[in-house]
């Protein structure tokens, strides 16, 4: 903790030097993307994307779970998503999973004990679980999906149940990307919706959820 305090104070200058005074009305966040990922400490969105402070609006949850939309749910995840798309008007959403996810592995091996009632409820809710992968080929063949990838695609499906997402997609003002970061190699894969497979990430890779046709 002492190291954290020493690094946090004092700062020689604001971390984001935009050339705009902090008290000016225009000094407000204008992130380029909403980055949804796991709370795992090995995943560092700004390092992964090469972005500076102010360029990413981050949403981190245990197991990078995005619950299905419920109009009556008082959910911080839903509120953050709605704020990013409605108030901040981010043009891109990046849903990023990762390999060797401790939270997912713990759930698969043994659900959290009764001593962790909130975590147990979070992981055992049916709305959070990936369904069967209809496109998955025989285990071990090229193109087959891992349980982590199936989980990630389930969250993509959940994301598309939110009205704030569907509205923006329908008006072609939002792109949704699905990535998987490999903790061991540092490589990132992207979901190619047209080919229905994960491919090495590259600029030409189409968005996982393309805008709806006019």
Regions found by a protein language model. Name each.
Residues 1-31, 40, 64-79, 85-91, ...:
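Divalent-metal-activated hydrolytic enzyme cores
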Residues 30-33, 56:
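A common structural microfeature
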Residues 35, 59, 95, 178, ...:
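Divalent metal-coordination and catalytic microenvironments
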Residues 38, 98:
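Histidine-centered active-site/metal-ligand motif
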Residues 91-97:
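Well-ordered alpha/beta subsegment
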């Amino acid at each position: 903790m002492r190291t954290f305090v020493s690094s946090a104070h004092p700062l020689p200058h604001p971390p984001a030097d935009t050339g705009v005074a902090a008290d000016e009305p225009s000094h407000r966040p204008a992130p380029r993307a909403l980055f949804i990922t796991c709370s795992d400490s090995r995943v560092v969105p700004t390092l992964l994307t090469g972005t500076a402070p102010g360029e990413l609006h981050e949403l981190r949850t245990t197991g990078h779970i995005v619950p299905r939309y419920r109009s009556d749910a008082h959910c911080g995840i839903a509120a953050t998503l709605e704020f990013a798309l409605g108030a901040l008007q981010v043009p891109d959403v990046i849903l990023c999973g990762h390999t060797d996810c401790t939270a997912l592995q713990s759930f698969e091996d043994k659900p959290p004990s009764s001593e962790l009632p909130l975590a147990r409820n979070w992981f055992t809710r049916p709305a959070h679980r990936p369904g069967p992968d209809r496109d998955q080929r025989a285990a071990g063949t090229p193109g087959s999906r891992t349980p982590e990838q199936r989980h990630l695609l389930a969250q993509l499906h959940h994301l598309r149940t939110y009205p704030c997402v569907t509205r923006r997609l329908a008006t072609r003002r939002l792109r949704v990307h699905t990535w998987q970061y490999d903790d061991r190699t540092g490589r990132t894969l992207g979901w190619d919706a047209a080919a229905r497979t994960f491919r090495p990430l590259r600029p030409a890779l189409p968005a996982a959820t393309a805008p709806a046709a006019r």
